[in-house]
A protein has these predicted regions:
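Core AdoMet radical
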Residues: 1, 11-28, 38-56, 64-95, ...
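Catalytic cores of alpha/beta
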Residues: 117-133
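Radical SAM enzyme core and accessory elements
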Residues: 172-224
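Distinct, well-ordered alpha-helical segments
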Residues: 29-35, 56-63, 122-126
Length: 224
């Protein structure tokens, strides 16, 4: 409450409000804050979201009252691969919400993807879909988190790394004038240049499948 009081008392100097998570559309204090912020055209509301909210979500509805909104969508695959990687999320709902936001004249969209063994091959497709079909203003690619060595793309087979590298180089050439995308892709290519021989990711996903009743090997047969 003290933070909300401080922000609202000093809101005339605000240039941007950044809502992240957890999932910001589920954090009740965000609604309390947003209701007290004037809907100024020179104030950017940035939102990082898993895109699983219902369209009548009160926080989403309050966000949409602002004239300048930027939604960053967490996208680690498409279709069944998205559903597998982002457990509990649903690709169809994601796209429904993306298209809902597309229809809002005050909203810009961008996407964020984690580069790891399960997204490496699909990354160019994901970028193209959001940049060309959705009209994203940008796309960020994050490296695999620390402590997740076994999920890093350096551990892919030489054959797959070669294919991924070729596709990423082509995608780099396509987006070379977008400094953020180009820089992120360069980092992905550098990751592929590292030596890695761990196949622990196979056991990692096998163990998840035992618990969840899923089958990563069916979705990614080339990695098995």
């Amino acid at each position: 409450d003290r933070i909300i009081e401080f922000v609202t008392a000093n809101q005339s100097g605000l240039k941007e409000i950044y809502l992240s998570g957890g999932e910001p559309t589920l954090i009740k204090y965000n609604l309390k804050l947003l209701k007290q912020i004037k809907k100024r055209a020179d104030l950017i509301i940035r939102v990082n979201s898993n895109m699983q909210w219902k369209q009548d979500n009160k926080i989403v509805q309050e966000i949409l009252k602002f004239p300048n909104v930027l939604f960053t969508c967490s996208i680690d695959g498409t279709g069944e691969k998205f559903n597998y990687i982002r457990r509990g999320a649903n690709w169809n709902r994601t796209i429904e919400n993306v298209k809902f936001l597309q229809g809002q004249p005050n909203v810009d969209l961008r996407a964020n993807t984690v580069f790891f063994v399960l997204t490496a091959q699909q990354l160019p497709e994901i970028i193209d879909y959001f940049m060309e079909e959705i009209g994203s203003v940008d796309h960020t690619i994050n490296p695999c988190g620390m402590g997740q060595y076994h999920l890093r793309c350096r551990n892919l087979s030489s054959e797959i790394k070669s294919l991924v590298r070729e596709n990423l180089n082509n995608t780099f050439e396509k987006y070379k004038h977008n400094l953020n995308i180009a820089g992120n892709l360069k980092n992905c290519i550098l990751e592929l240049d590292n030596d890695g021989s761990s196949v622990e990711y196979k056991e990692y996903f096998d163990n998840i499948d035992i618990l969840q009743g899923t089958d990563w090997r069916k979705l990614y047969p080339e990695l098995t």
